[in-house]
Amino acid sequence: MRQKEVLAKSFQGPAAVCRTPNSHVYMFNNGSGDSGDSSEEESHQVVLRPRGKEHQKNSSQRPGAGTMVLLQRELAQEDSLNKLALQYGCKVADIKKANNFIREQDLYALKSIKIPVRNHGILTETHQELMPLGASSSETRVTLVDLPEDEDAGGATTQGNQLTDFFKGIDENIERAVHSDVFHGDSCCVEAPDQLLLPITQKPVADGADCGIQWWNAVFLMLLIGIVLPVFYLVYFKIQATGEPSNGLNATVVPNGSMTLSPVPGQAPRLAIPVPTLPASDSQVSPTTQAGA
């Protein structure tokens, strides 16, 4: 039991050290160097952070409390957390904390938003600086609400006239660029005014090994060259081979029974040879005569 109590006590260092030529003397607060006999124990102080109304009362009593105020205004269609943070010189995390935002998309579910700014500053003293840019500036309403200063929140940077004008100029440039006619087209081309525009060269129709013809034209040409022309070629030479005469004479039968040979060019004319004609009665032979013969 004694050992547990000794272990529970914290070590207490010497309050002073006296050096002598032969030794060192350590002086403690209770006059003894034994840590087990020390009756003092280290106390750990835990500071609890108050919340709710008690936190507001304590924060109002501290010096510097009430230096932050909430600026409440109606939201426009083009507003975003980044734009509001740049415009009013605060942090996006402070805006989320003041409006209990979990995500940035929660902004579009509200009609008005609270923005933390410094009290007695340029943004709170001048109403013109509180109005947003664009057409929705006339509908802006400003309400000042006391914001208790948080211990963890750091001090916001001081807002000057030059910084305000700088962000105001950025917003004006963005607004002008959105409503300009340059971005209404499908593509945006920025060129120098004195730059000469080269004529557009039309792509040739013939491309590749087929010279740009259609597929059915290619099939027709292949059929014509591979089938039709060879058939005509064979028919022509067949006709030429069968049309040549076998002899150099042309025989003509004359009705009177003689045959006349017409002269052929390059040969001597010949006489006509008479051919005897038999009467019709002699040409018929009776069966009895043929049997007797």
From Swiss-Prot:
It comes from the Eukaryota. It is a single-pass membrane protein. Residues 28-65 are annotated as: Disordered. This is LysM and putative peptidoglycan-binding domain-containing protein 4. One of its GO terms (cellular component) is membrane. Residues 236-293 are cytoplasmic. Signal peptide: none annotated. Glycans are attached at residue 30.
